[in-house]
């Protein structure tokens, strides 16, 4: 059992339209902020933490110049305010071949 306010895995995250949408949002926002051209591939895993909304930590694959890489994105969402913000986006490694 996760501690109150702690991170917990999102069940069925690879098939979740919501998580997929948040991951795509993260890549789009990163591309805008960094003038990058990453292309979303797939969600690898996702966790969520309740913090005046929900903070999602999403591990995803994206192509950078045709090469698959793994990134970690943190997206803060408050659906009742129609608020969504990319908090962090970082490269964590190369995707397995």
UniProtKB/Swiss-Prot annotation:
The record marks 5 as: Reactive site. A motif (Secondary area of contact) lies at residues 49-53. Keywords: Protease inhibitor, Thiol protease inhibitor. CDD domains: CY (cd00042). The keyword Magnesium does not apply. The keyword Secreted does not apply. One of its GO terms (molecular function) is cysteine-type endopeptidase inhibitor activity. Gene3D superfamilies: 3.10.450.10. SUPFAM superfamilies: Cystatin/monellin. Belongs to the cystatin family. Phytocystatin subfamily. This is Cysteine proteinase inhibitor. It comes from Vigna unguiculata. The lineage of its organism: Eukaryota, Viridiplantae, Streptophyta, Embryophyta, Tracheophyta.
